[in-house]
Amino acid sequence: GEKIYEDFNLSATPGQIIGVTGAVACGKSTLGKTFLCEYPYEGRICFHGKELSGMTKAEQNGMVGYLGHDPELFNDSVRNNILLGDDDDPEKYLKAVCFDGEVAEMEEGMDTIVGNGGVRLSGGQAQRLALARTLCHKRPVLILDDPFSALDRKTEEEVFANLRKLAADSIVILLSHRLYLFPEMDQVLWMEDGKVTAGTHEQILEKFPEYARLYEAQADGAEAHSTQEGGPDHAEK
């Protein structure tokens, strides 16, 4: 098949959050799914010196956690969607994603049934519930595909700060078209014209005019309109 990108090098350590962005249809989601071995690749993807493609499926699942931009929620309670049968405290993860207040106001609380795919929740609520589950079952590497796309900026900032604390022992690869928080990323990957360039936010800002244009437009408050129905959620406190 045709190559989507080439000449891509990245080294990361636990505790780092790496922001990945680029123009529309640049291959962000494909890059994320490459870490799930859903796409063939040339070269090596190594964790602790072990090649990803050489691991068993169980080893891969134990190494990489993935949250897609379409939350996969079950027709079950808020609690069970987070815990998936584990013995843990779901409240901690609801607080981390700024969803605890809204759940507390629901008539059935954590026992509220969310419907297949979270149809009984708003887009932002479903997104935060799926992120809470991902954090409850976190892996050494977490791939998060546009996890904040349905959130307002204030909630996004709070959830990001909590993510850094809860995932301090993981490598987080955050794919996003929203760049508010990219100055806080430990590394930024910019995808353009089939190439992926790694650097700090400042380095990418200086080197790539399109990245600078997108970042400055959003920093000035000219955020691109969400394509999701209903627009960004405003989390209740």
Predicted regions and their residues:
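Conserved ABC transporter NBD signature motif
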Residues: 43-51, 60
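C-terminal portion of ABC ATPase nucleotide-binding domains
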Residues: 161, 165-168, 183-237
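Catalytic Walker B motif of ABC-type/P-loop ATPase nucleotide-binding domains
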Residues: 142-146
